[in-house]
């Protein structure tokens, strides 16, 4: 039996069914379109993802918001009421400051549940890299490692998860203010794809560019081989 309950957030970007199968509860972010909030439920509702992509096809740009302290409080309280200790691995602070809301909620609940532990860790990770870190923590939990052993592993490995990605559409970066309008237009016409990674604080860094998707894929794969332990002989997990 696991010594503690492991928890995460929907930005692990894997199907809800997978996290459920691993016994990992999830708190959902939301996205907002036309002032209407929709849960990022990781496909738990089979209509959710088709609806989201239909919005994008219609030219609607979603916005997101942080999970607030009250939502974290209710979520953590429900987990603590199951009677065990809780380790929550949060979405990286380089992408959102929601983790600060989680810290505040956890501090409040520690006073209400003095006989239990509630620990919150900033993953410094995003998307499937975040999911990979949580999955590794679940492996330790299932191997009957203690919460402290798992925390030590997460703290050591959160800066070793390598995120590598690219984009074929600069217009989303223009809307987010990361590139200027003219640069986005010219880049899109020329087929320029920025090559990106996360730095050790979990922030997006555009460090290179490629002309066309094939070149972007090739550069991405090459850089993954450079950073993987053992290079092309790496045989561990890799989440895409």
Where are these regions (language model features)?
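N-terminal, well-ordered alpha-helical segments
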Residues: 50, 54, 70-77, 100-107, ...
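N-terminal glycine-rich phosphate/adenylate-binding segment common to multiple enzyme folds
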Residues: 69-99
């Amino acid at each position: 039996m696991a010594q503690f309950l492991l928890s995460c957030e929907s930005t692990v970007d894997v199907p809800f069914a997978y996290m459920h199968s691993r016994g990992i509860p999830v708190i959902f972010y939301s996205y907002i379109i036309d002032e209407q909030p929709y849960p990022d439920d990781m496909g738990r509702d089979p209509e959710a993802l088709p609806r989201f992509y239909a919005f994008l096809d219609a030219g609607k740009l979603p916005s997101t918001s942080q999970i607030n302290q009250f939502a974290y409080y209710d979520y953590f309280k429900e987990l603590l009421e199951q009677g065990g200790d809780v380790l929550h691995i949060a979405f990286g602070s380089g992408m959102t400051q929601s983790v600060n809301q989680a810290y505040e909620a956890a501090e409040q609940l520690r006073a209400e549940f003095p006989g239990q532990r509630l620990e919150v860790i900033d993953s410094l990770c995003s998307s499937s890299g975040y999911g990979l870190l949580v999955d590794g923590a679940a492996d330790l939990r299932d191997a009957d490692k203690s919460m402290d052993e798992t925390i030590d592993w997460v703290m050591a490995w959160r800066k070793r998860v390598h995120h590598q990605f690219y984009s074929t559409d600069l217009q989303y970066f223009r809307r987010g203010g990361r590139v200027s309008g003219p640069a986005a237009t010219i880049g899109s016409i020329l087929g320029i794809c920025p090559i990106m990674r996360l730095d050790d604080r979990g922030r997006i860094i555009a460090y290179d560019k490629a002309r066309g998707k094939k070149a972007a894929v090739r550069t991405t794969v090459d850089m993954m081989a450079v950073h993987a332990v053992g290079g092309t002989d790496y045989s561990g997990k890799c989440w895409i």
